Amino acid sequence: MSEIKMPEFLTVESALKDSGLAVTPSELHGLLVGMISGGLSLDDQTWKPLIYDYTNDGMGWPDSAIKVGSAVFQCTVAELTAEKLALELLIPSEKESLMNRADGLSEWVNHFISGLGLVELKLDKTSDALKEALADLEEIARLGIDEEDDLEEQESLFEQIVEHVRICVLTIHAELGQQIHTDASKTVH
């Protein structure tokens, strides 16, 4: 079985821009991860109309954008439902400036929260750990980089924040997200 690989940030960015869509790779991935972590069905195409409504006034996407969006969705599902939980955020690479990466992370987190809203997350039925993770993400979404502070220190803090975002997202997904059930996972007594 071949491993599903996340498309590169620049590949996704190019496909979205070339299609005339006003959504960044970070925003798209954040939305998808939010919807999946909020309990979106993994077995159908319900994510597409939600994305179309949110990003393109309900209009469908051109084929090239659908292809890359589907690849991002499939890779995200694979990451979030694997035995070894992993999540790589689709944000600008380390080659980009810290400011660009911080902006990408902020876009990602804001759209993750929006993705949870798109699947109508009901906070009154969630655990305290989930509420705390969501509160942390809301705070992180408001963070910024101060160009006058020590950039080396901010670089280190940024990496810690990215890791904390992953932990918060995986906490939310563990409580609300669906898992892919296979015959191999069934226990025989």
From Swiss-Prot:
Annotated coiled-coil segments of the chain: none
Pfam family, one: UPF0149
Entry-linked SUPFAM superfamilies: YgfB-like
Domain of life: Bacteria
A Gene Ontology term for the protein's cellular component: cytosol
InterPro entries: YgfB-like, YgfB-like_sf
Family as reported in the entry's similarity comment: Belongs to the UPF0149 family.
Protein name: UPF0149 protein VF_2102
UniProt organism field: Aliivibrio fischeri (strain ATCC 700601 / ES114)
